[in-house]
Amino acid sequence: MPRVKGGTVTRARRKKTIKLAKGYFGSKHTLYKVAKQQVMKSGQYAFRDRRQRKRDFRKLWITRINAAARQHEMSYSRLMNGLKKAGIDINRKMLSEIAISDEKAFAQLVTKAKDALK
């Protein structure tokens, strides 16, 4: 019985890895062994950063809300506490968008939060 080397399967697998490594710097997009390692590492980075992205956006929203709240002589934490006590249930993403795009609406929210804290 002749020995089967599986050339087409191996070539296809290697070609797939090299295709995934397209655009990488140096030998990482041409040499199979190095490309394979980099594709694995890239996958780890992608997995980690999909979770990190959620934390980064939340930080950004909080920073924006804090900056807008301080223009109305109020800190972020007092604003959020006031909104909660006023029964205004709005998430940070939407609050951040309101702070950027609609100053008047945000000012009204701040006054309602201030009233609820009194």
UniProtKB/Swiss-Prot annotation:
- Disulfide bonds, which pairs? none
> What are the record keywords, sorted?
Ribonucleoprotein, Ribosomal protein, RNA-binding, rRNA-binding
Which regions span the lipid bilayer?
A: none
Q: Which Pfam families match?
A: Ribosomal_L20
Q: Which SUPFAM superfamilies match?
A: Ribosomal protein L20
Q: Name one GO biological process term.
A: ribosomal large subunit assembly
The record ties this protein, via PROSITE patterns, to: RIBOSOMAL_L20 (PS00937)
Q: From what superkingdom does this record's organism come?
A: Bacteria
Q: Name one GO cellular component term.
A: cytosolic large ribosomal subunit
Q: What terms describe the molecular function in GO for this protein?
A: rRNA binding; structural constituent of ribosome
- Establish whether keyword Ribonucleoprotein is in the entry: yes
Write down the InterPro entries for this protein, in alphabetical order: Ribosomal_bL20 (IPR005813), RIBOSOMAL_L20_CS (IPR049946), Ribosomal_protein_bL20_C (IPR035566)
HAMAP family xrefs: Ribosomal_bL20 (MF_00382)
Q: Which NCBIfam families match?
A: rplT_bact
Stored PANTHER family: 39S RIBOSOMAL PROTEIN L20
Q: Which family does it belong to?
A: Belongs to the bacterial ribosomal protein bL20 family.
Protein's job? Binds directly to 23S ribosomal RNA and is necessary for the in vitro assembly process of the 50S ribosomal subunit. It is not involved in the protein synthesizing functions of that subunit.
The protein's name in its UniProt record? Large ribosomal subunit protein bL20
- Whose protein is this, by species? Staphylococcus aureus (strain NCTC 8325 / PS 47)
